[in-house]
Amino acid sequence: MSDIRVLYDYQAFTMQTHGGVSRCFMELYKHLPGSVNAQIAIKESDNVYIKDIESVKPAHDRYNKFICRYNFWGKGHLHLWYDKLTQGGYYPDYNKNYAIELLKKGDFEVFHPTFFSDYFLPYLNGRPFVLTIHDMIPELYPQYFSRDDIQVVMKKKLAPLASAIIAVSENTKKDIIRILGIPDNKIHVIYHGCSFPHTSKREIQISNPYLLYVGDRNNYKNFDLFVQYVTPFLLSHAEMRVMCTGRSFNCKEKELFTKHQLEERFVHYWVSSDDEFFSLYHQALCFVYPSEYEGFGIPILEAYKASCPVLLNNASCFPEIAGDAAVYFHMDSIDSDIVEKLEKIYSYSEKERNALLAKQQERLALYSWEQSANQMAKIYCDIASI
């Protein structure tokens, strides 16, 4: 494989301080083989995954150093004017202008935007670009997104123009073909790896046994249905709790807990590190994923890495990613067998639990960032004809 220069842009790293999209791009960037000379077109960001790149400064530094000792009405507007006068644009444009500068310079063979803005199109000068599509959630659930959402509008525009499209699962690839009409041979499936540690340096002390729910709880995540269907199991096991990460519970969720007499049974835990996450997974009775749709489902791999039994809605990409190393239930607005499957896991003998965990480790071996980065490098070379 010949050496190739690849330019990534700033988008995911200014959208998120942490999150799946920016973390995935950073893991790929870090694990690319030596034959790929990669650069990220970004000057400042508060994203936690990019902080080790010395040339990238914290975004808040420039903002805070300007009349930092004084607070007064209108200071925010003054900052906007300061940015325009001194940096050629407010913070998002600061990175965008730098990306355009590098695009114009042309020291790359392949461009890989990290989200769906089309700002780069006039500056490619015939060079190919790769587009990663993590999921088709906005297209499949339009009721939860605005009609002019950038993902919907720009995905539709950019996908036909890309030299190659990366899908993170075969299920996502099928959705891209069906919804966007992209030819099969243009879409390459590259699975994610898992960034979790193998052990935890910090053991969280939790007195009650618990089920673990990770991440967002909105809409297609099926959290409300999960609360409804898990109620009989919780009421028959007084010691059991449901530990939830992500944002704090809102009023609607608290009302839902009260309705089912579960006010003390759902507990929110704010996670501040991978070590804490690992410990939460490792101590749980099981990790439960009731979501109706995901592009990949990285928490499945995290649970596998932490030797935590996994209970999945039999939907979307879950069977593809988890294989036979998870337990599956069905869930819809009418019915669910989740209680039956929870009771099964609850009553596992040590031998049965260990057998499931052994399958998880076998399955986990299929996913690594090194393998993903090598596959990506081959695609870069193929489309650049090097």
Per-region residue spans from a language model:
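Carbohydrate transferase catalytic cores enriched for Leloir-type hexosyltransferases
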Residues: 1-386
